[in-house]
Amino acid sequence: MQRILLAEDHDDNREMLMRRLTRAGFEVRGASDGQDALTHALAWKPDLVLMDVSMPIMSGLDATRMIRAKLGATIKVIALTAHAMNESREACFEAGCDAFATKPVDWPNLMEEMNRQLRFW
């Protein structure tokens, strides 16, 4: 079973996505801020992280940079953000994200991107 870490600071969004990911057959853990995401990623080593870009304590981009510094590219990271501007995409890729998805989440597109990332891992 593939392991997904969902880093999302909004409780309702995190719980809803965790339920959907669990029903889709993934083992899922949640993180409510960037520091929590970093801690879980380093300890649990999921196959993929869905990383909200804007979170308290540590941003998703800073958490991604730290994951990359500690673990390299061993974990796939998909950035989740409400900002679809090119600058936002570039910032995500510069931080080390493998892919980019906008919020609100388009479930079929997110699943397609997750499958693409996990297949090439």
Model regions and ranges:
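Acidic catalytic/metal-coordinating carboxylates
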Residues: 9, 33-36, 59-65
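Active-site beta3 strand of CheY-like receiver
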Residues: 44-50
